[in-house]
A protein has these predicted regions:
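Extended mid-to-C-terminal alpha-helical interaction segments
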Residues: 256-258, 309-315, 320-342
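Cytosolic signal-transmission helices at domain junctions
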Residues: 33-42, 334-348
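Short, compositionally biased low-complexity segments
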Residues: 15-20, 34-38, 53-59, 139-157
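Intrinsically disordered, low-complexity polar/acidic regions
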Residues: 41-45, 70-298
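Membrane-interface helix-start motif
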Residues: 3, 238-241, 300-320
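Intrinsically disordered, low-complexity regulatory regions flanking sensor or DNA-binding modules
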Residues: 7, 118-120, 313-314
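Membrane-proximal amphipathic alpha-helices
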Residues: 29-62, 69-77
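Extreme N-terminal signal-anchor transmembrane helix of membrane signaling/transducer proteins, especially
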Residues: 2-34, 317-331
């Protein structure tokens, strides 16, 4: 075999080996990217399932509270407090349970006087703009009003809410109207709490089967009420037990209410990505639609894979072995070629 033939064989072997190593490296990178994509999908599925469980829990707790209000005595605040405490103890994302009752405008003064005598000495019916200092909007004349009469827990910073007419709360007026004669809960837009933070309310009208007479007409719990479940939006965020992958991704949850379709519940921004990450590595995206009856929510996720995520210790070890093989095999082939070439010259 001539020297030229030997060199051609060596070149072909080197190119073939380069192709094999490149293909193996490609498969390794694809496998590692696939593993990260599976971790991404598992983490997003876990967060979606956790949020769905909380939304379903909200409906179940509100349904139980509505059933309780249909049976509670007119002024039995102690029983209502005990029930609210037991119903919300296992669900820290539920911020507050509230009750508002319907009062005829013609009976407002009698109602206020009765509650001052039997409940709160300084009780008064008030408008929401009056306690927040926000501009009041002109209201149409109505035959009824819906003051808030029960809060649990009765937080000191929320005491001003007692007696607030729900229909004067701008973000609740439309939801309150939808809840009337509605067998299903209605969700409000996301809003800023009076005591700070963002929240939304799940509300449902409560109708008693028996009519109230005499003193019952001026009791805390009347014939027609609205049960309200207040949920802080930041409490819906994943807790400490959430997958570590969630810390490196961007995600957002938007709830679709009757009043608005872009209620942002919560969001999380990922750290800025490097240019090499953006150019050379994939960006994972996924969207979940939680078809809750009263709280339909869209969850969107996004994660840019970074080189520091990809270059794990195991990955670097395998890449190192491939690099050694890439250098060693051509070197041994060249050494063998030179030995054969030297032997051929000696034979000549």
């Amino acid at each position: 075999m001539t020297t030229a033939r030997f060199r051609q064989s060596l070149l072909a072997l080197t190119i073939a080996w380069l192709g094999i190593v490149a293909f193996a490296t490609h498969l390794l990178i694809r496998a590692e990217i696939g593993r990260h994509e599976r971790d991404f999908e598992a983490a997003t599925q876990q967060l979606s399932n956790g949020l769905k469980h909380k939304l379903d829990t909200n409906e179940a707790v509100l349904a139980g509270f509505v059933a309780f209000l249909r049976a509670v005595e007119g002024n039995d605040v102690e029983s209502a407090t005990r029930y609210a405490a037991s119903a919300t103890a296992a669900y820290p994302h539920i911020y507050m349970l509230e009750v508002a009752r319907r009062v005829s405008v013609s009976e407002e003064r009698q109602f206020e006087a009765a509650l001052r005598q039997n409940w709160l000495a300084d009780f008064t019916l008030k408008s929401f703009p009056g306690i927040t200092g926000s501009p009041a909007t002109p209201a149409e004349a109505k035959m009824e009003t819906w003051p808030v009469l029960f809060l649990y827990p009765a937080l000191p910073e929320a005491q001003a809410i007692y007696g607030v007419r729900l229909e004067t709360v701008d973000y609740l007026a439309y939801s309150l109207a939808l809840a009337k004669k509605n067998a299903r809960p209605v969700v409000s837009p996301v809003f800023e709490l009076y005591e700070g933070g963002r929240a939304y309310i799940l509300l449902q009208e409560v109708e008693r089967a028996t009519a109230a007479k005499g003193l019952a007409a001026t009791s805390l719990f009347g014939n027609t009420m609205t049960a309200l479940l207040v949920i802080r939006s930041d409490a819906l965020l994943p807790g400490p037990a959430a997958p570590a992958a969630l810390k490196t991704m961007a995600y957002a949850a938007q709830m679709r209410s009757a009043g608005r379709s872009d209620n942002l519940l919560f969001s999380h921004e990922a750290e800025p990505s490097g240019r090499l990450d953006t150019w050379l590595l994939p960006r994972f995206q996924h969207e979940f639609v939680i078809d809750n009856v009263s709280q339909p929510t869209v969850l969107s996720f996004e994660q840019q894979l970074a080189w520091h995520d990809l270059l794990t210790a195991e990955f670097l070890i395998i890449i190192g072995l491939l690099a050694c093989a890439f250098v060693t095999v051509p070197a041994l082939s060249l050494r063998h070629f030179r030995a054969v070439e030297r032997g051929a010259r000696e034979l000549e």
